[in-house]
């Protein structure tokens, strides 16, 4: 979801700083430092015919994962949503006034207005949800005018569609 929002904005334009190495929590292996890079936005597509065609988006996703200290297991990748906002400003030159908002501090009407205003302004919204069993990050990128919001779940189009926020 983080990479999808970054691709939408095609930002940053300038090279990233070095992203330091860290040790994962589950298997305690060291993820090596990533050197500064400039993302190749023009090479990123929505679909790919050849495996090598995805190298540019794979690089973006690797930098996103490392910037938020992702933990990797055989079945999943995990990170904290709060780390996304930190990484966007620290490593990817996003506005320091970027806000992280939580539904639990708003009623549903306020939340719909917040999301609608972002979509109307041309800004897809990074979302996440979680339970005791795990979580998932996804993107809200549209509104139908009838109280339904479009979500991209990040599963190659599977289950993407319009849903109520409630």
Specify the residue positions occupied by each region the protein language model found:
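Active-site-adjacent substructure of cysteine-protease-like catalytic cores
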Residues: 86, 90-152
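Second-shell loop/turn segments in exported
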Residues: 69-77, 102-105
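Active-site nucleophilic cysteine motif
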Residues: 1-7, 53-57, 72-88, 136
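Catalytic Cys-His active-site segments of thiol-dependent hydrolases/isopeptidases
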Residues: 146-165
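Active-site nucleophile-adjacent alpha helix/oxyanion-hole segment immediately C-terminal to the catalytic cysteine
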Residues: 1-42
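Flexible glycine/proline-enriched surface loops and loop-helix/loop-strand junctions
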Residues: 60, 64-72
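Sec-exported extracytoplasmic/periplasmic mature domains
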Residues: 2-11, 69, 89-94, 120
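N-terminal leader/propeptide and maturation segments of large enzyme subunits in energy/redox metabolism
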Residues: 45-48, 67
